[in-house]
């Protein structure tokens, strides 16, 4: 039977050693689902609330026992007494949103609500004997995503003196996901060798990318291009580059202040100068995607950037849109950006996540399914990427098990789909003039 008989949450640890929420759901028939909730380092101010305890004597205030209690003492009784079917995802998600009663899930916590939402979906898939991607996407979920591999970490994700948070490679010239993963791995290892030869650090950051002390942004870019060529691939044809600028992390009082991360030599740019700078980088290097190139509240700057390079570069809103359909709708109406980053914990339920992806795709925006810097062994985002035919996934570098787990899950899915599996490569950037 599909009726849920037990919902249980516990406090576990994420990839940074910080507490997070794990939720388990059980049905009458024994179907079971488990979910672990991720956590971000650089967060948009409009994100749903991640509930932390604030007790400095325990986990430095980062405990999640309040969120766990909210699952076990508030959400679980509501689901069990209401005799909800595990197959009724939308009703359960809406019930939790109503039970919270705040616009940002600040009462129960998005980390509590999301854990239940994903665990319910996993239990439903188990009940039906289906893989999660097939339960979520039906027979039409068959497109494997282009991986956006974050091989150099800067900004808030590392101690490297570079303002931009992520430098990514995208193997769009591959013909299968399996091949794209191999290309990325070969480039990653070539990059490590090049860094070692230069006497630079090869320790990795939160998302598995290297965090050496480059001599600035262009040094990082040119070193990555060198690694692509050393691996035997053609930059700008087979492999493109991408940035996550995370501009909100160094924007203050109308100024993009690179010195926050780059020290006394870091530039200070107005919005117009920031647009000019990003355009110069796009003109000089094979860049296909830029995330959060402008501050989340600098909508005039976003408009300028979109008008300037939005026809040839994917401009992804992360802190800008925070997986929120109300904000995304405003962005679509005003021609802001051309893509949305999808992070399940920014909004807090699977239902709202799927609504955001659908809205973006209907408007001709791309949707990039993404991890967080604080991750776990949970692989749900891999299944979501295939279920929604998103075409792109951002889940870190080619090291750290919390990142590799998602890539390995995509390899399994590609194998399961066999001849029906698609990898569209450059065609996944369907709204660009490429």
UniProtKB/Swiss-Prot annotation:
* Cofactor binding summary note: Binds a second Mg(2+) ion via substrate during catalysis.
Q: What are the recorded Gene Ontology BP terms?
A: glycolytic process
Which residues does the record give as phosphoenolpyruvate binding sites?
41, 343, 372-373, 394
Q: Which residues form a coiled coil?
A: none
Effect noted on mutating residue 139 to A:
Significantly impairs homooctamer formation, no enzymatic activity
Keywords of the record: Cytoplasm, Glycolysis, Lyase, Magnesium, Metal-binding, Secreted, Virulence
What's its EC? 4.2.1.11
Q: Where does Mg(2+) bind?
A: 244, 291, 318
Pathway given for this chain reads: Carbohydrate degradation; glycolysis; pyruvate from D-glyceraldehyde 3-phosphate: step 4/5
- Can you quote a single GO CC term? phosphopyruvate hydratase complex
> What are the positions of the active site?
207, 343
Q: Report the SUPFAM superfamilies cross-referenced here.
A: Enolase C-terminal domain-like, Enolase N-terminal domain-like
InterPro entries assigned: Enolase, Enolase-like_C_sf, Enolase-like_N, Enolase_C, Enolase_CS, Enolase_N
* Necessary cofactors: Mg(2+)
Q: Where is the signal peptide?
A: none
GO molecular function annotation: magnesium ion binding; phosphopyruvate hydratase activity
Where does it live in the cell? Cytoplasm; Secreted; Cell surface
Query: Which residues are noted in the entry as (2R)-2-phosphoglycerate-binding?
Result: 165, 343, 372-373, 394
What does the record give as the function of this protein?
Catalyzes the reversible conversion of 2-phosphoglycerate (2-PG) into phosphoenolpyruvate (PEP). It is essential for the degradation of carbohydrates via glycolysis. 'Moonlights' as a laminin receptor. Binds laminin when expressed on the bacterial cell surface; this probably induces destruction of the extracellular matrix, favoring invasion and dissemination.
NCBIfam families per UniProt? eno
State the oligomer form and interacting partners: Homodimer and homooctamer; the homodimer is inactive.
Give the family this protein belongs to, as stated in its UniProt record: Belongs to the enolase family.
What is this protein called in UniProt?
Enolase
Q: Which organism is it from?
A: Staphylococcus aureus
């Amino acid at each position: 039977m599909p009726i849920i008989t037990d919902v249980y949450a516990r406090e576990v640890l994420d990839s940074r050693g910080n507490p997070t929420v794990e939720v388990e759901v059980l049905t009458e028939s024994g179907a079971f689902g488990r979910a672990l909730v991720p956590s971000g380092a650089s967060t948009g101010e409009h994100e749903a609330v991640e509930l932390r305890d604030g007790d400095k004597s325990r986990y430095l205030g980062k405990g999640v026992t309040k969120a766990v209690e909210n699952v076990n003492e508030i959400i679980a009784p509501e689901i069990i007494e209401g005799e909800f079917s595990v197959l009724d995802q939308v009703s359960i998600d809406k019930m939790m949103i109503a039970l919270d009663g705040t616009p940002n899930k600040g009462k129960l916590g998005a980390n509590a609500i999301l854990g239940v939402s994903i665990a319910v979906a996993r239990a439903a898939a188990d009940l039906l004997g289906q893989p999660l991607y097939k339960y979520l996407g039906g027979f039409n979920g068959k497109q494997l995503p282009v991986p956006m591999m974050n091989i150099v970490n800067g900004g808030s994700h590392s101690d490297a003196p570079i303002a931009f948070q992520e430098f990514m490679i995208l193997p769009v010239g591959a013909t299968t996901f399996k091949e794209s993963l191999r290309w990325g791995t070969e480039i990653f290892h070539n990059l490590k060798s090049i860094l070692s030869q230069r006497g630079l650090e090869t320790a990795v950051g939160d998302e598995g990318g290297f965090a050496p002390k480059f001599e600035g942004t262009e040094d990082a870019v040119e070193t990555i291009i060198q690694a692509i060529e050393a691996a035997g691939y053609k930059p700008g044809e087979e492999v493109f580059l991408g940035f996550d600028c995370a501009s909100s992390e160094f924007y203050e009082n109308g100024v993009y202040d690179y010195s926050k991360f780059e020290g006394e030599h870091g530039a200070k740019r107005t919005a117009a100068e920031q647009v000019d700078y990003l355009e110069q980088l796009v003109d000089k290097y094979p860049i296909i995607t830029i995330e959060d190139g402008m501050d989340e509240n600098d909508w005039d700057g976003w408009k300028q950037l979109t008008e300037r390079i939005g026809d040839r570069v994917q401009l992804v809103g992360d802190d800008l849109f925070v997986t929120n359909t109300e904000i995304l709708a405003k962005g679509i109406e005003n021609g802001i950006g051309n893509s949305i980053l999808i992070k399940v914990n920014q909004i807090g339920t699977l239902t709202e996540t799927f609504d955001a992806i659908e809205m973006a795709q209907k408007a001709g925006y791309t949707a990039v399914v993404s991890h967080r810097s604080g991750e776990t062994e949970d692989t749900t985002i891999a299944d979501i990427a295939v279920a929604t035919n998103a075409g792109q996934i951002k889940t870190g570098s080619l090291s750290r098990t919390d990142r590799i787990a998602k890539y390995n899950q995509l390899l399994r899915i590609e194998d399961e789909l066999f001849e029906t599996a698609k990898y569209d490569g450059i065609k996944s950037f369907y709204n660009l003039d490429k």
